[in-house]
Amino acid sequence: MILLQQVWLPLPNRPSTSPPMSVAARSTGTLQLPPQKAFGQEASLPLAGEEDLAKRGEPDSALEELCKPLFCKLCNVTLNSAQQAQAHYQGKNHGKKLRNYYAANSCPPPARMSSVAEPVATPLVPVPPQVGSCKPGGRVILATENDYCKLCDASFSSPAVAQAHYQGKNHAKRLRLAEAQSHSFSDSAEAGQRRTRKEGSEFKMVTTRRNMYTVQSNSGPYFNARSRQRIPRDLAMCVTPSGQFYCSMCNVGAGEEVEFRQHLESKQHKSKVSEQRYRSEMENLGYVQ
């Protein structure tokens, strides 16, 4: 009997996990949300300029005026939210404008100054110029046709590349132009030599003819063997006291009027006249050689 009574004892009531209505009401009534910040206060983020100022330890009021929470006067950009402001102030464009601002005010950050000053301290050793490539051992290697093309001013990395260049159209075109120029130079040199020979022979021929008509006389320098010969007016300034025709410009003389007029019509005389005219014009303009 005792055992049966112990088995059939009523179980105690467990406390319910749900709180009473009054407690729930009190908990919901006392629940407070965190205070929301104003729209202008949300954008108070750490700016790139403020970080640089914190590193420098010197407040820059002018930079603070330029970098507002929602407006960057330094970049002339209007910002709509805190996220956009953070992205702008941490971007590359704002950092570049900030570096330009420091450079304009002659106050770069000290970290940059130390990084720039280190390579300057290393002494510079002048290297004498050398022709060709030089190995560390000191041996100079001269460039060959497989390394460099002097005509096209092109360098090659391997003999295969050099062979392809020499068989190409550009190299062939340059080669034809160089050959044409060399031929033109040789032709002009030969023409100049022929011209000098022709001029020399003409001068000798005229001088020999002048010597043929020269009359030896003891009557004086103003003796004219053909005083009765009529001298035309256009050649009056070209007659010597001895009665010979003389061209001072070409240093050529002739005994007869026909021969002298042939000289005046020659290419040698005309070229000398044009050259003298050009020199006189240049002297009148002030270009004196």
From Swiss-Prot:
List residue spans of Matrin-type Zn fingers: 70-100, 147-177, 245-275
Concerning SUPFAM superfamilies, the annotation shows:
beta-beta-alpha zinc fingers
On induction, the UniProt comment says: By DNA damage in a p53-dependent manner, and by 6-hydroxydopamine (6-OHDA) in PC12 cells.
Show the segment(s) annotated as Disordered. 180-202, 265-289
The UniProt keyword set, sorted, is: Apoptosis, DNA damage, Growth regulation, Metal-binding, Nucleus, Protein transport, Repeat, RNA-binding, Translocation, Transport, Zinc, Zinc-finger
Which residue ranges have biased composition labelled Basic and acidic residues? 265-282
Protein's cellular compartments: Nucleus; Nucleus, Nucleolus
Tissue specificity comment: Highly expressed in brain, gut, lung, and testis.
Choose one Gene Ontology CC annotation of this protein and give it: nucleolus
Q: Which GO terms describe its biological process?
A: apoptotic process; DNA damage response; positive regulation of apoptotic process; protein transport
Extract the GO molecular function terms from the UniProt entry. Answer: RNA binding; zinc ion binding
Pfam families found in the cross-reference section: zf-C2H2_jaz, zf-met
Keyword Nucleus present in the record's keywords: the answer is yes
| Subunit description | Interacts with dsRNA.
What is this protein's function? Acts as a bona fide target gene of p53/TP53. May play a role in the TP53-dependent growth regulatory pathway. May contribute to TP53-mediated apoptosis by regulation of TP53 expression and translocation to the nucleus and nucleolus.
> What protein name applies here?
Zinc finger matrin-type protein 3
